[in-house]
């Protein structure tokens, strides 16, 4: 299994609202079939940093990052149902390494500057996704807190609006301020 499959990015998340679509995870076969072009090493590089033809859904990315935050459980997402979770059997050291990186992103020197002074400590992932529109990017920001035992996680996406830390980060901060400091 690829890591994309293991983290649930190649299947629907099972959310109980209509209209869910699959993320697009490009492959050499997909590129040849859809674009009539061969796969180059540069395509692999772009895929590894979340660029190029990769198109993740908000709920798909949220669910995969939630599995890091909660210690390795990949859960169905839902509005009005209890989630069913599957243990991914990831090495605890690997989960902790990624989680530490996400905590670092929300700490001074990281990219999630809207959470540098937040208590309790949070972990986050910022993103600026290409759109194939001239100079337009989607702003992503995923965050969970408290970092040691998360009770809330949010993923904010603002389409065609700029950088995740600049645009979506402040919106996520408002949600977390309301949750932790009403």
How should these model regions be labeled?
Residues 1-161:
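Beta-lactam-recognizing serine transpeptidase/beta-lactamase-like catalytic domain environment
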């Amino acid at each position: 299994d690829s890591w994309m499959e293991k983290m649930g990015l190649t299947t629907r998340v099972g959310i109980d609202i209509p209209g869910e679509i699959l993320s697009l995870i490009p492959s050499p076969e997909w590129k040849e079939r859809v674009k009539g072009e061969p796969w180059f090493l540069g395509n692999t590089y772009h895929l590894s940093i979340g660029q190029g033809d990769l198109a993740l859904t908000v709920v798909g990315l949220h669910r995969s990052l939630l599995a890091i935050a909660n210690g390795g459980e990949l859960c169905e997402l839902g509005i009005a149902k209890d989630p069913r979770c599957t243990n991914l059997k990831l090495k605890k050291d690997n989960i902790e390494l990624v989680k530490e990186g996400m905590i670092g992103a929300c700490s001074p020197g990281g990219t999630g500057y809207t959470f540098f002074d937040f208590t309790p400590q949070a972990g986050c992932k910022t993103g600026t996704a290409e759109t194939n529109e001239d100079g337009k990017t989607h702003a992503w920001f995923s965050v969970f807190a408290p970092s040691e035992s998360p009770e809330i996680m949010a993923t904010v996406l603002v389409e065609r609006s700029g950088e995740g830390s600049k645009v979506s980060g402040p919106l996520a901060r408002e949600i977390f301020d309301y949750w932790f400091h009403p």
